[in-house]
Amino acid sequence: MWRDMLEQVSELGNVLPRFTAPRCLLERQAVGGSDACHTTCPHEAVILGQLGSSVDIDPDRCTGCGLCVQVCPSGALEYDLEPALQSVHDQRASGGASLACAPSGAGGPTVPCLGRVTPALVSAAGAWDVPLTLIHGDCPNCPVGAPDVPARVEQLGRAHV
């Protein structure tokens, strides 16, 4: 029990996504490997190694927005979805669920940035038949994510309807 609590606390304090090299298409040198994590990062925190054969996250640049995780086709980059999934699941009885980005100040269940909303989270809400409302703040001036976070999340939602 204590170990689980300590892991949850350490997860909250760590803005860096977990990286699992064996899943990474670049690390595996798979044909058509993906550099989507690198090209989507608004803070230039995802660094590709020589010849694009490795991926590193610069802890000084990473804000934890989650956009790299959202676009990773192999799941090599990830955050723990359990708190967000549990929140959506717990809100089912009210007929809908909401998640807000923390900088919005909207209150209620939050994530650091809506960039952390992944296809798995959208799919889970759909599978539970829970309408999911996402609340963002002033994205163009936010130091965590990027100005186009709402458009990216909307596109993600359309792809999983």
Q: Where are the regions a protein language model picked out?
A:
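Conserved small/polar residues in nucleotide/adenosyl-binding loops
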Residues: 159-161
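Well-ordered, non-membrane alpha-helical segments in soluble/globular domains
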Residues: 118, 147-156
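Extended interfacial segments that mediate partner engagement and assembly in macromolecular machines
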Residues: 74-78, 89-122
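Glycine-rich phosphate/pyrophosphate-binding loops
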Residues: 127-142
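Iron-sulfur cluster-binding cysteine motifs and their immediate structural context
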Residues: 32-57, 67-84
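PEST-like low-complexity intrinsically disordered regions enriched in Ser/Thr/Pro and acidic residues
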Residues: 112-114, 138-145
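Ferredoxin-type iron-sulfur electron-transfer modules and their immediate structural context
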Residues: 1-40, 44, 94-103
